[in-house]
Amino acid sequence: MATVRVGGHITLLFSIHDDALLPRNQGSRGAGICLEHGVSVSIQESGRSEVIEVGQEMAGWYQDIPDIKSKGTTEVTINAQIPSESLSEQMYDDLIDELRQARLLPIDANYSIHVDIELPLSQGFGMSAAGLSALALACFQMTEKGSVPQYFRAAHHIERRYSGGLGDVLGLYVGGVELRTHPGSPPSPGVARGFSLDSHILLVWQSSESKHTSEYIDHPDWKASITRAGDAAVDRLATKQWDASIWNELLNEAQTFGRMSKMLEEPSRQSMLASVQSVVNELNLQAKVRARLCMLGTSCVLLPAKSNEPLEESDLLQFSERLRSINLDSIVTRIAPQRVV
């Protein structure tokens, strides 16, 4: 048995590059933040399938013909802290099949999988990427076959199959505050880099509104406006040193992206962000806090205004209480550290 927890991922700005034939070449350029809260996955082998044709012994130089075994079964149980209609057990089953085809898992093994999801789905928190990455890494931990990048690549393939995200898996692969400069699966052709920034942050969402990523990345008008704004932002950021010194510029680019991509023009997002900003003003946190949209949910994140002045958990808990009174949900989490890859 193996258990792995992978935090979620929020995207602050991005462009869409999903026209390539192969899933490994599809993805996004963009910038985002990896989270402490996410998805925990446990996997346990629960037996082997039956032999459907017994092998034969051969004379001469030929090897024996091995037994032919049926494909193993996969039983998936999902526990979501926040119930959602978007739960997909099949997604996890498909990842197991992908790893079987890559010969990283035995074809005849039966598996029992338990998934614990800590954040809401379809709110831009990267839960599909976190869940798939956690299952992939749990399989690696269980078998110790292959290498970690192979498992991340498989997770990216399945996420693209379900249009669950574009660059979330690549972002999680590098961790921290990340910049994705070339689309695709990790470790290649996707290219990304990250840095660590230790701070509490607050995720905010409107439960009555949720958006599946495919509503945008599969829509030609949204795709065009998002990609124009996202590519321009990444081009500017990519010329700079990617460390904590870029923080203020990243916050500015995220705000510009929301406006240029027209995401800020959507009434539900506009209303939510205005409500959050009014609480920022009410609690006199204007100098400490910046609110930015999470792509692509009806959600936002409260981030430190300065990289060297992390947010206090007590301030964010007070903020969360106030949001509850205006029917906005929230949770305090942290920025996850950069991964060593």
What are these regions (language model features)?
Residues 1-121, 144, 333-341:
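ATP-binding N-lobe of GHMP and related small-molecule kinases
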Residues 4-5, 23-24, 32-35, 106, ...:
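Solvent-exposed alpha-helices and their adjacent loops that cap or buttress functional pockets
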Residues 104-110, 139-155, 312-318:
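Phosphate-handling active-site elements
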Residues 149-194:
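Alpha/beta catalytic cores of group-transfer enzymes, especially the acyltransferase/condensing modules
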Residues 244-341:
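Glycine-rich, charge-dense phosphate/pyrophosphate-binding loop(s)
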